[in-house]
Amino acid sequence: IAGKVDVPIILAFTGDDNGVSSHPVVSVKLADGASAVLAEWHQSAVGLSAPLMAIEVGDKARLDYAKVQRDSAQSAHLAATGLTLGEGSVFEGFQISVGGQLARLETHITLSGENADCTLSAIYLGRANQHHDITTNMSHAKGHCLSNQIIRGVLDDSARGVFQGKVHVAPDAQKTDGQQMSRALLLSRKAEADAKPELEIYADDVLCAHGATVGELDETQLFY
C-alpha cells in the first residue's frame, strides 16, 4: 500500500454451518510515508477459524486498524497477528471479541524503528460459558518508542476471560515508554477473569508500568 488511502480497506471473513475449518493468511505492507485504515470482520456459523495476519508498517507510515470477532457460539476462533513498525511510524489498533465458544486473539508487535508509536486497545464480552483470551507481546527493539496497551473485559454467567500481556525492552531500546493496563468487570459470581501482565526489561533508562484490576458491580450503586 503506497500513498494515502482515502477509503477504509475492509476484509470480511464469513463461514457457513457446514462445520469446516478455515485458515486464511493475509499479508499487508505499508510503504514508507503511507497511511491507511484497515478493518477485519470475522463471522462464522460453525467450525474453526484460525486466521493469520502479517502487517508491516513502513517508516513514517500510519495504520489505523480494527478487528471484530463475532463468530457463533458453536465455533472456535484462534487468531494470530504479527506487526512490525518502522521508524517514526504510528499504529492505532482496536480489537473486539464477542463471539465463539473459544476465542483467542494473539498479537505480536515489534517496534523495529526509533520513535515508533503504538496503541493497542482490546475489549472482550463474554456470557454463557464462553472463553475469551487476549494475548499480546510488545517488543521494543529500538529506543525512543512509545507503546500503550488498554484491555477491557465484561463477563457474565459462567464466562471466563484471560489477558496475557508482555512488554519486552531490548538492551538498545533506551528511552522506551511502555504502558499496559487490564480491567475486567464481573456481572456474575460464576464468571472468572485472569490477568497476567509482564515486563521484561534489559535497558536502564525506560518508563514502563503495568497493572490489572478485576471487580464486581457495587450492589448499592446499582440500587440507587
Where are these regions (language model features)?
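Conserved beta-strand/loop scaffold segments within soluble protein domains that form the structured core
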Residues: 1-223
